[in-house]
């Protein structure tokens, strides 16, 4: 099958990949190699003309938007943080579910004056506090968010919370719920026009697989 007819799906390693592969399998699409045991970045599948590329989670939207992939699976947190105006977002896959939260020591979010917020989600945090009319100082971090309140780097953090075990282990707790997060299927706008029939068919299969898992 020619490249013009091939569907390329961008996934990121980790929880999204682990949760997406069973959904694809429900649609009859399986990788021909185990991505966890391979250094390859492009994987063929059992369906001719459908392949998977593995990229960083934050790179899924630009790969899809600029034509490196026809479709992708990205967390709503990534789409909110980095923008998704150039993408179609037709389906909530209902996987990799968690919550975007403000967290910190009890009562830390009620302190008067400018709040110091440590996060890697600076755009989400900025919009959230702007809607509240609250003055904040945003401190960009790339990991170990829970450490910030412990060493006085920030009053609170804005981060993804799943079980909350890491927060509790460090004497922190969820303070404010910003939004629920799950992974979404995103589609390149040009691909949706040029490969409409194939993409529409895959969308239908995935929607059925998602619904079946909800039942």
Swiss-Prot record:
Entry EC number(s): 2.4.2.17
Q: Show the InterPro entries listed in the entry.
A: ATP_PRibTrfase_cat, ATP_PRibTrfase_CS, ATP_PRibTrfase_HisG, ATP_PRibTrfase_HisG_short
Q: Has keyword Flavoprotein? A: no
Pathway it works in: Amino-acid biosynthesis; L-histidine biosynthesis; L-histidine from 5-phospho-alpha-D-ribose 1-diphosphate: step 1/9
- Where, subcellularly, is it found? Cytoplasm
Q: Does the record's keyword annotation contain ATP-binding?
A: yes
Where in the chain are disulfide-linked cysteines found?
A: none
What reaction does this catalyse? 1-(5-phospho-beta-D-ribosyl)-ATP + diphosphate = 5-phospho-alpha-D-ribose 1-diphosphate + ATP
Report any one BP term from Gene Ontology. Answer: L-histidine biosynthetic process
| MF terms in GO | ATP binding; ATP phosphoribosyltransferase activity
Show the domain comment.
Answer: Lacks the C-terminal regulatory region which is replaced by HisZ.
Q: What is this protein called?
A: ATP phosphoribosyltransferase
- The protein's organism comes out as Alkalilimnicola ehrlichii (strain ATCC BAA-1101 / DSM 17681 / MLHE-1)
């Amino acid at each position: 099958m020619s490249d013009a007819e091939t569907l390329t799906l961008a996934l990121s390693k980790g929880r999204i990949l682990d949760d997406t592969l069973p959904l694809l399998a429900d649609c009859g699409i399986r990788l021909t190699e185990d991505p966890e045991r391979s250094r390859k970045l492009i994987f063929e599948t059992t369906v001719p003309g459908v392949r998977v590329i593995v990229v960083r989670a934050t790179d899924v939207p630009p790969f899809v938007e600029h034509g490196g992939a026809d479709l992708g699976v990205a967390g709503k947190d990534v789409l909110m943080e980095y923008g998704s105006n150039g993408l179609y977002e037709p389906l909530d896959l209902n996987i990799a579910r968690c919550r975007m939260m403000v967290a910190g020591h009890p009562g830390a979010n009620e302190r008067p004056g400018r709040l110091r917020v440590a996060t890697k989600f600076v755009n989400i945090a900025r919009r959230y506090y702007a809607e509240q009319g609250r003055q904040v100082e945003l401190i960009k971090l790339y990991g170990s968010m829970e450490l910030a309140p412990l060493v006085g780097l920030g009053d609170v953090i804005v981060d993804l919370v799943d079980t909350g075990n890491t927060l509790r282990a460090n004497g922190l707790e969820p303070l404010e719920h910003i939004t629920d997060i799950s992974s979404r299927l995103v589609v390149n706008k040009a691909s949706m026009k040029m490969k409409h029939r194939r993409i529409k068919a895959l969308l239908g299969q995935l929607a059925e697989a998602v619904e079946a898992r909800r039942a």
